[in-house]
């Protein structure tokens, strides 16, 4: 096990021309390979902003994010896009599946974007959908799937490129207790298979307690989560 990602003194400030709003203030964190880290916080605490920065979807006001000791903000736009597609997976509370495509096509999309041959991309996508228990739903569009099934498709899509790190924003937030438990078990199984690391943003303290480690984000700053 080694350190996969580290951020130092990460800050984010928005300026609307009249006043400045400090969203994140000197955030420091690290995550190791195969580790599940929870970040707990209320709405508006900056959790989603932090994930956007860790995923190179936004630029910080100050601070650094190192992924395997490489500064992701020193990458060109093309390098950042390649980094996101090949090294990261994203899971959101809203699944963001493309409604006009089947489950199989949605999951294959990251590999198709990476210019993999369609036949190979579909093969990998089918394997991943089988792992999440959706072998019988390959040709179904999102509108034909249940909420839990759509979230499993989103997780399969996040993992189809075998990313080293998955960033998950409230992955069980819209699900009932039974379906949410199934998603948690699935994350564990896939972590064990692929050694993927997870950073999970949640307001669900019970979920956070089941992960390897948890931090609380309050007023833009991180601190250890106490039981």
Curated annotation (Swiss-Prot):
It comes from the Bacteria. Residues 5-226 form the ABC transporter domain. The keyword Zinc does not apply. GO terms for cellular component: plasma membrane. Pfam families: ABC_tran. It is found in: Cell inner membrane. Part of the ABC transporter complex LolCDE involved in the translocation of mature outer membrane-directed lipoproteins, from the inner membrane to the periplasmic chaperone, LolA. Responsible for the formation of the LolA-lipoprotein complex in an ATP-dependent manner. This is Lipoprotein-releasing system ATP-binding protein LolD.
